[in-house]
């Protein structure tokens, strides 16, 4: 059978989006890996699937698969594209929608200027909720990688993140340290690793090594986690502009127990069909 799909991106973080509300199919990890190959398939960072909700309290179910076939809890850039997709496909006429994900419920708001604001919910900071192996919650943790001590913050935005402060993201060891920290045993479910450069209290640069993907042009949940870590440490103040290789995100966080609000673009690239 042929499935209709849309290719989209949020700041260069690219997605294949499938509507499984009006289409019916069982997508397996082998299909995701086949389609995700940039040489022989469609090529993407993540596959986003739109499904009917399992509860009357939400509008849709939102599932996310990395290009390696693994299903993950959350994707902030994908959430913005999800909101734009369901509007463009007339799956809803609402400007504000509630969506269930593996990492919890999020709220998406489409603004008149085309930007999308995502209420990511409050960050999870307790080690057991991230998950991260530590005896107690702290602003930062020291872990060892190949005999080297690394200090990082641990934050969950529905998915686990480690955030390191660096002097300059251009020279940061993203491709050497990133994959080692991603699979560090203190992150039982692996982690996305952010390298944060603070420019001033309201402006920072960020590169992210994403779990199961590698470095991407942008990571929405990574930007949220970096802003939270920076605000908790006193390096940053809300609102924060986070510059990623693919562009800029606007992050707001009022403090513990409050939701993180992320605003940024969502762009449709092309429509296509793929054989299942």
Curated annotation (Swiss-Prot):
Domain of life: Bacteria
Alphabetical list of InterPro entries matching this protein: DAP_epimerase_AS, DAP_epimerase_DapF
Its EC number(s): 5.1.1.7
One term of GO molecular function: diaminopimelate epimerase activity
Top enzyme category: isomerase
Protein's GO biological process: lysine biosynthetic process via diaminopimelate
Binding site for substrate: 13, 46, 66, 76-77, 159, 192, 210-211, 220-221
Involved pathway(s): Amino-acid biosynthesis; L-lysine biosynthesis via DAP pathway; DL-2,6-diaminopimelate from LL-2,6-diaminopimelate: step 1/1
Subcellular location field: Cytoplasm
Pfam families: DAP_epimerase
Active-site residues annotated for this sequence: 75 (proton donor), 219 (proton acceptor)
Keywords carried by this UniProt record: Amino-acid biosynthesis, Cytoplasm, Isomerase, Lysine biosynthesis
Homology family: Belongs to the diaminopimelate epimerase family.
Protein's UniProt name: Diaminopimelate epimerase
Native organism: Pseudomonas aeruginosa (strain ATCC 15692 / DSM 22644 / CIP 104116 / JCM 14847 / LMG 12228 / 1C / PRS 101 / PAO1)
Encoding gene, per UniProt annotation: dapF
